[in-house]
């Protein structure tokens, strides 16, 4: 059993219990949805499990880091939806250009985004959220990640990775889509 300290109290959890499962026990204490955990002072993803006794607190969508995690996940869901409805579109053609109020301006190079396409994308995004398809994290060597993103025509990511010092890169994927993100498509 692991001892998890939250808000000054100790709770026991079986080894292998993820932060996401732990977060469910405390979600009712938060007005916004829990997005990330702070474990022993470090921000962690909910899909991880504590490996030893840990002191935790949570970040929600209302917190900057939690909101950014939500936006990355929503972007992945959007890209997956676009890929599903327009399979000829490469991920590098889809750009999150800038924020507008609480929304984001998205462009798809080479595609005239009609109302019909936007409606299909929204419908597909809602389906993906409803399915709550798990998002899996995979740490891969930098060279393999670069090769993967070259194959996916994600040139901006390839350029960024070339300057990355770490030898490993975290890549996130659903059953049929790979990207750099929350534990499910519903978060």
Task: Describe every region a protein language model picked out.
Residues 1-75, 80-100, 123-124:
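Ubiquitin-like/PB1-type beta-grasp interaction modules and other compact soluble beta-rich domains
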Residues 68, 115-116, 180:
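Short helix/loop capping segments that flank catalytic or ligand/cofactor-binding pockets
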Residues 90-93, 129-139:
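Short secondary-structure capping/junction motifs at helix and strand boundaries
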Residues 98-102, 164-165:
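Short, ordered beta-strand-loop transition motifs
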Residues 102-109:
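A generic structural motif
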Residues 109-113, 120, 124, 134-177:
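Active-site neighborhoods of enzyme catalytic cores
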Residues 178-184:
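Conserved small/polar residues in nucleotide/adenosyl-binding loops
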């Amino acid at each position: 059993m692991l001892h998890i300290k939250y808000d000054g109290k100790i709770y026991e959890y079986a080894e292998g219990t993820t932060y996401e499962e732990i977060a469910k026990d405390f979600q009712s204490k938060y007005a916004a949805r829990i997005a990330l955990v702070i474990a022993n002072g470090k921000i962690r993803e909910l899909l991880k499990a504590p490996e030893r006794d840990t002191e935790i607190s949570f970040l929600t969508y209302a917190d900057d880091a939690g909101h950014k995690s939500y936006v990355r996940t929503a972007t992945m869901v959007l890209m997956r939806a676009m890929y599903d409805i327009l399979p000829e579109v490469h991920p590098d053609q889809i750009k999150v250009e800038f924020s507008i109020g609480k929304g984001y301006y998205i462009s798809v190079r080479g595609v005239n985004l009609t109302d019909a396409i936007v409606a299909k994308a929204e419908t597909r995004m809602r389906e993906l959220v409803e399915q709550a398809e798990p998002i899996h994290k995979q740490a891969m060597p930098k060279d393999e990640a670069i090769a993967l993103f070259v194959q996916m025509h994600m040139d901006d990511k390839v350029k960024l990775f070339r300057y990355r010092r770490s030898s490993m890169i975290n890549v996130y994927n659903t059953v049929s889509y790979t990207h750099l993100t929350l534990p499910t498509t519903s978060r």
